[in-house]
Amino acid sequence: MSFLTEWLTTIVLFILFAIVIDMLLPSSSMQKYAKMVVSLLLIVVMLTPIFKLFKTDPEVIFEYLTKNGQSESADIKNQINSKKIEIQASQRAYILEEMAVQLKKKAEERFSHDEYKVGRIKLTAGEKVDSEEDIKTISVYMAPSSEKTVQTVAPVHIDTDHAYVTKEAAEQKEAKQIQTQLADIWEIGSEKITVHMEGGESVGNE
């Protein structure tokens, strides 16, 4: 770009110089000779880039063109890789979502509990997701089985922590039983399943 700017600047300056010479010379055969010389010089100036091209080492020209081609090729390759990663991520997310839907459907068909039902399921997996065997973790969020099970309880003030500990232990035991039951339904190792109870207790690996 700088070479082109320099070339155009040279042409403009040369034309201005030719105009000044033409104005200074008197109207005579000398002026005609001067115009012819100036015209020839202008042609030489305009053809300067071509002369430089012929003087340039062909390897230098080839290297310049190759670098530009490689740069454009690298940009295109990066764009293709970026799009490929986006598509793979979308496909992976879709597959995990479909697996979660199927697992929830199985649970709804076979899971039985008086107070809870399977609410939301969240899966994690490695880069490769071809089957349920590729699932690393299953987070199961339990919800009340019906509105009747959700009751408002008046606050109770107790001086000891015995009742609180008993309630916590009971919820953990309940979550453990649900974890085992879901593992049997899905035929998946219970160590992959984490059960989150509505009250905040959870059992499993996270």
From Swiss-Prot:
It holds the Pfam family Spore_III_AF. Coiled coil: none annotated. The lineage of its organism: Bacteria, Bacillati, Bacillota, Bacilli, Bacillales. It is found in: Cell membrane. It comes from Bacillus subtilis (strain 168). It is a multi-pass membrane protein. It comes from the Bacteria. GO terms for cellular component: plasma membrane. The chain crosses the membrane at residues 1-21, 34-54. The gene is spoIIIAF. Keywords: Cell membrane, Membrane, Sporulation, Transmembrane, Transmembrane helix. One of its GO terms (biological process) is sporulation resulting in formation of a cellular spore. NCBIfam families: spore_III_AF. This is Stage III sporulation protein AF.
